[in-house]
Amino acid sequence: MSRNLYPNFIQFIQDSMQELTDRGQEVELAGVLYHIGENDMSWGPFRRGAAERMQTLVNASRESLDLPELKCFVSQQPPTDDKQVNEIDVTSMIAEVAAADPHLIHVKTFDLPPQEKKLVLDTAGVVALGEELAKSWLKES
């Protein structure tokens, strides 16, 4: 995975689970949440590869955590409406990958509150995103 974020992501999960276990808690990782955001929705090369990167992250996470059926909830914000990238149907590509994986839930968060900036979610947008992920989690649990 790029920029060394992936090892830190996995280590954080493992450390958190171990910390809870050390405190006497029974721990089960029931799923992970991942957001496909601004860069993957707006820049052509990222938009073209978003679905493949998502699948790579999901597969690698399951392998690293030794949980082949780990549920992954992947939220997607609306694709940027720009003539330079509109021919790249990123939503369909992501939906196709999700449809082939019974443990991957594609959460289309296309009704977020209006944002001041074109791509960046503000506080209200992040809260709404969290609410949509929570609804999806509850529906699937």
Positions of PLM-derived features:
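Cell-envelope and extracellular/periplasmic
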Residues: 1-141
